UniProtKB/Swiss-Prot annotation:
Cell wall formation. Catalyzes the addition of glutamate to the nucleotide precursor UDP-N-acetylmuramoyl-L-alanine (UMA). GO terms for biological process: cell division; cell wall organization; peptidoglycan biosynthetic process; regulation of cell shape. This is UDP-N-acetylmuramoylalanine--D-glutamate ligase. It is an enzyme of class 6 (ligase). One of its GO terms (molecular function) is UDP-N-acetylmuramoylalanine-D-glutamate ligase activity. It comes from Clostridium perfringens (strain 13 / Type A). It catalyses: UDP-N-acetyl-alpha-D-muramoyl-L-alanine + D-glutamate + ATP = UDP-N-acetyl-alpha-D-muramoyl-L-alanyl-D-glutamate + ADP + phosphate + H(+). One of its GO terms (cellular component) is cytoplasm. ATP binds at residues 124-130. It is found in: Cytoplasm.
Length: 458
């Protein structure tokens, strides 16, 4: 049951509120809380100089700033605490606040709690952003006023009073955002669950439990969309409270959406041909099947077909950059897990020269080697994980006698040059790192943009 936002306005007015993290989603949140009459203190590990103009703007607005080294030590004595998504609820600072009686929440939790529109929550280890974007495109194509947020789009909480009951709201939700969420999501989509973010979660079970929160608080009229090909997601129906629908790219019996003989079907109706979908790869077929099920009651088959045949994809996802000397270069920087890289490799019709490596999320790389070798002509490694990935391919050779040429470099420029030197006309070079970017870059977008810059300067 959605609550009246006036309740929140009355609750927050005059309260001593802490906001941890002065990032993209929290900047508009802080301004909004000030507008609602809260006494706001913003916390961040950066200094005022590093934050730049926004720190001056906040001071003018009357926001107290607690910045720099030891900033969380000063997180005490607040009535309400808005945490940043990556901050664990069992951190020392938040446990202290909880003991003091603080209400601990996040921008996304409060948004979903009070949002009047129909909320579609998309989560999963891979395919979240593309599926979120497809769902949003489908609803917009049908003529609905559609808002897109969460991990993508713009922070929505400060716009909550503009969102009407007939509007549609599509959210990409990470495991970090979901860990503490206890709110009802009308339509939940779980694309898949594979090992990911094990540097942040205690173990795989905690990661799975976080993902389950996307449907845990649903009621009987709500909808859960699950992947019937994934070992974990196919069993989620046992815990669902609402209606459950399934999709599969490999089988048809018992499936609500499926792929058969080159065509995509939803509830027995043909939507489109796989070859006519602009974004290639079987993983994108699965993304479309999930999206079709999520919006089936609101969107016509005609609109589904039109989006599938016109939507060109999201940046940094198997994105073609250019062809040089007969060699095609692709940017798949979004691929921050081995399973996402494997999905990207399957989109190509021939083995590729793969550029991989980066920040260590403590996930195994054996699947990349053992399941991906047929799609890899050579692999060029960089980043913190290069030795771990190299070891996985060495194990493949020792156990199966399968040799994949492995090269390595220190920088992205160096690995591009190595790949260029071993490539022949007709080859494909793709950046699909199977790792996060944080060892060398701010995020996967910056990594992808740098790769595009290097390739465009060849």
């Amino acid at each position: 049951m959605k609550r009246d936002f006036n309740e929140f306005k009355e609750f927050i007015k005059g309260k001593n509120v802490a906001v941890v993290g002065i990032g993209v989603s929290n900047i508009p949140l802080i301004k909004f809380l000030v507008k609602l009459g809260a006494k706001v203190t913003a916390f961040d590990m950066k200094s005022a100089e590093e934050l730049g103009e926004i720190s001056k703007e906040f001071e003018i607005l009357g926001v107290n700033l607690e910045l720099g080294k030891g900033y969380l030590d000063r997180l005490t004595g607040f009535e309400v605490v808005f945490k940043t998504p990556s901050m664990r609820i069992d951190s020392e600072a938040l446990l202290r606040c909880k003991k003091q009686g603080a209400y601990i929440t996040s921008e996304m939790e409060e948004f979903v709690r009070y949002c009047k529109g129909r909320v579609y929550g998309v989560t999963g280890s891979d395919g979240k952003t593309t599926t979120t974007t497809i769902v949003s495109k489908l609803l917009s194509q049908e003529g609905y006023k559609t808002w897109t947020g969460g991990n993508i789009g713009t922070p929505l909480f400060s716009n909550i009073e503009e969102i009407k009951e007939e509007d549609k709201v599509v959210l990409e939700l990470s495991s970090f955002q979901l860990m503490t969420m206890d709110v009802e999501i009308d339509v939940a989509i779980v694309t898949n669950i594979t090992p990911n973010h094990l540097d942040m979660h205690k173990d795989m079970q905690e990661y799975i439990d976080a993902k389950k929160n996307v449907f845990k608080y649903q009621r009987e009229n709500d909808l859960l969309v699950i992947n019937d090909e994934n070992e974990i997601t196919k069993n989620l129906d046992k815990e669902a409270k609402g209606k459950v629908v399934r999709f599969s790219s490999k089988k048809t019996e018992g499936e609500d959406a499926y792929y058969k003989d080159g065509k995509l079907y939803v509830h027995g109706k043909e939507v489109c041909k796989k070859d006519n979908i602009i974004i290639k790869g079987m993983h994108n077929v699965e993304n479309y099947l999930a999206a079709f099920l999520a919006v089936y009651d609101e969107v016509s088959i005609e609109s589904m077909k039109k989006v599938a045949e016109t939507f060109g994809g999201v940046h940094h996802r198997c994105e073609f950059i250019r062809e040089v000397d007969g060699v095609k270069y692709y940017n798949d920087s979004i691929a921050s897990t081995p399973t996402r890289t494997l999905a990207g490799l399957k989109a190509f019709e021939k083995p590729v020269i793969l550029l991989a490596g980066g920040y260590d999320k403590h996930v195994p790389f054996e699947p990349l080697a053992y399941e991906g070798y047929e799609k890899i002509k050579a692999i060029v490694l960089f980043g913190v994980t290069k030795e771990k990935i190299k070891a996985a391919f060495k194990r493949l050779e020792e156990e199966k006698g399968i040799h994949v040429p492995v090269y390595s470099g220190e920088s992205l420029e160096e690995v591009v040059n190595i790949a260029k030197s071993i490539a022949e006309s007709g080859d494909i070079i793709t950046l699909s790192p199977a790792c996060a970017s944080f060892d060398m870059f701010k995020n996967f977008e910056v990594r992808g943009d740098k790769f595009k810059e290097i390739v465009n300067n060849i």
